[in-house]
């Protein structure tokens, strides 16, 4: 097997307008165009805000077209957070993978927390996305606090662990501790895109502080707390 090429990654925390998918897609597309990265990771529920009653977003929704176009023009792959439809009705909380070919469901959050179980159905298994030979294990927020989720994901054979999150400022240190633990336990770099700015679900303030950590816990890149910031690093095999 040929060696993996370096992978340029951006963890982004774009501005978000509650329930305005079209506006949020434009913000995502602008971020992708500016990022200069092969992989751009966005926070939990980044396309709607952390709005627990947001309608499910179908991967074929035409409002996603500007993000698909931005990925096509930039040669990027984006991981965006959204409420996702379930067959037979209901919603899960998960991740869309978007590239120049379109959008598809990549992962459904396994470990729901807070008020989420009243609104969403938990996913039943781990998810992996492959880009340029890199196998990326996926997670959403509370998943990172469940060692069994990371272990099941790592058992699929992963080269990095990638998560979107929404946290309070007081939980920023917890988020970092979890990222470092997962990296050490499974020998992979960890990327966390964390929501910045106010959103729903009682999050009048969020942590931001998106980051990228090496497998040994070294901080490779880190955002501040403000919307619109990005953290960028090059992962090497």
Question: What function would you assign to each model-found segment?
Answer:
Residues 63-79, 145-228:
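CN hydrolase (nitrilase-like) catalytic-core segments centered on the catalytic cysteine
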Residues 40-41, 135-140, 162-163:
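Short hydrophobic-aromatic micro-motifs
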Residues 1-39:
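N-terminal glycine-/serine-/threonine-rich phosphate-binding loop
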Residues 86-156, 170-177, 236-237:
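Active-site catalytic loop in hydrolytic enzyme cores
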Residues 2-9, 128-137, 160:
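Beta-strand-turn-beta hairpins that frame and shape the catalytic cleft
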Residues 8, 94, 209-210:
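Conserved beta-strand and immediately adjacent loop positions that scaffold enzyme active sites
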Residues 17, 85-87, 197-199:
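Short glycine/acidic-enriched loop and turn motifs that connect beta-strands
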Residues 26-100, 169-188:
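Cys-nucleophile CN-hydrolase/nitrilase-fold catalytic domain and related Cys-dependent amidase chemistry
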């Amino acid at each position: 097997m040929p060696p993996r090429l370096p992978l340029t990654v951006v963890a982004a925390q774009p501005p978000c307008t509650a329930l305005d998918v079209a506006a949020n897609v434009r913000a995502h597309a602008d971020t992708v165009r500016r990022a200069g990265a092969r992989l751009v990771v966005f926070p939990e529920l980044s396309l709607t805000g952390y709005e627990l009653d947001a309608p499910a977003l179908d991967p074929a929704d035409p409002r996603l077209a500007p993000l698909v176009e931005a990925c096509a023009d930039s040669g990027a792959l984006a991981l965006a957070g959204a409420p996702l439809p379930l067959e037979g009705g209901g919603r899960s909380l998960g991740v869309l993978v978007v590239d120049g070919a379109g959008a598809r469901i990549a992962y459904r959050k396994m470990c729901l927390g807070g008020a989420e179980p009243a609104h969403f159905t938990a996913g039943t298994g781990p998810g992996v996305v492959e880009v340029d030979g890199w196998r990326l294990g996926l997670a959403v927020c509370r998943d990172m606090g469940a060692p069994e989720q990371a272990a099941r994901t790592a058992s699929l054979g992963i080269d990095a662990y990638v998560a979107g999150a929404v946290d309070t400022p007081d939980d920023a240190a917890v988020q970092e501790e979890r990222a470092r633990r997962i990296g050490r336990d499974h020998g992979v770099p960890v990327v966390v895109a964390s929501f910045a700015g106010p959103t729903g679900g009682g999050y009048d303030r969020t942590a931001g502080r998106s980051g990228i950590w090496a497998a040994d816990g070294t901080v490779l890149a880190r955002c501040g707390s403000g919307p619109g910031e990005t953290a960028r690093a090059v992962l090497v095999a």
